[in-house]
A protein has these predicted regions:
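N-terminal ordered "arm"
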Residues: 24-28, 32, 44-80
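N-terminal basic/disordered segments at the start of proteins
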Residues: 1-51
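Active-site-facing alpha/beta catalytic cores
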Residues: 59, 65-292
Length: 292
């Protein structure tokens, strides 16, 4: 087996393995039927019938976690989705970098400040961003908190969708600040006004019932970078990795012979590979052949 890149140096390997075993007993974060639904939607994207929006934090944190913050992220995706769908006439596939983006790759394993060298910050799922000897030590207990916050985020998103928060008739309430603070705010406010007028007409004319919160109106799929492979493998359900609907391999771990590429090549999830400026065409072809 090749060396697994970008893995933390856990001070207590036995404790780490016990926590991974514990996480294996936890409920899945997503389900195979949801993953298969995303695959069907992505087929329509490939045919030119749908359009993907993927958005979210570079890395989620334990501190910036609340119902309002999650709603805020969802509102931004909703606003973009509605505007792009109205402008292109294409249905939108919404994929969030959310509910699992708690681990970061690093260029260097350590960081030095004022002559003090400590382990690099690898995301809240591994250690703290605080430059402190104790807090920078990789702590596997953080994986449990990452799981619980991911699960709470998923529960809130599902609840909001079921209760009509994502109904397009609520478009005027979705992140109005996004429009007012944008240089193109006037243009997009006009689009929102047109969408609202269209919905009002449909409702007033009695052409259809003014309910858009059915299961086909808006779905938010989750995604994150698959870095810590032991954690990802804890969510395996046959060939599905149920930590997220879609997983990707980053630029630092995408060598065609890496364990990360080997892992995603065996999944039934939709997967992706980040293509950076250092890659060449031959590598892209080799990765494509490997994961397909």
């Amino acid at each position: 087996m090749n060396k697994i890149l970008q893995q933390p140096s856990w001070p207590n390997q036995q404790q780490y393995l016990k926590i991974i075993s514990r996480i294996k007993q936890y409920p899945q974060l997503v389900y195979p039927n949801e993953i298969n639904r995303l695959k069907l939607e992505l087929k329509e994207v490939a045919k030119g019938n749908k359009f993907i929006i993927q958005g979210g934090d570079c890395a989620e944190t334990f501190k910036n976690f609340s119902e309002d913050l999650i709603k805020g992220k969802l509102k931004i995706l909703l606003q973009m989705s509605a505007i792009i769908q109205y402008s292109t006439k294409l249905k939108i596939v919404n994929i969030g970098r959310i509910a699992g983006q708690y681990i970061k790759p690093r260029t260097h394993s350590h960081e030095t400040r004022d002559g003090v060298t400590l382990p690099a910050y690898r995301g809240d799922g591994v250690n703290s961003i605080d430059f402190n000897k104790h807090k920078r030590q990789p702590n596997p207990k953080r994986l449990i908190q990452a799981y619980h916050q991911s699960a709470s985020t998923m529960n809130l998103i599902r609840s909001l969708i079921m209760n009509g928060f994502t109904d397009i008739s609520q478009i005027k309430l979705w992140n109005q600040d996004l429009l007012s603070n944008s240089p193109l705010g006037v243009k997009y406010k006009t689009i929102v006004k047109n969408i609202t007028s269209m919905l009002d007409f449909i409702h007033d004319s009695g052409l259809v019932n003014n309910k858009y919160n059915d299961s086909d109106s808006f779905n938010l799929y989750t995604s994150h970078e698959a870095i810590l492979l032991d954690y990802e493998k804890a969510f395996m359900n046959k060939n599905f990795c149920c930590s997220a609907h879609m997983l990707w391999v980053g630029d630092r771990t995408r060598d065609v012979n890496s364990e990360h590429i080997k892992f995603i090549s065996k999944l039934d999830n939709p997967v992706a590979v980040k293509i950076g400026p250092t890659i060449n065409e031959d590598d892209i072809c080799k990765i494509y052949e490997k994961i397909n």
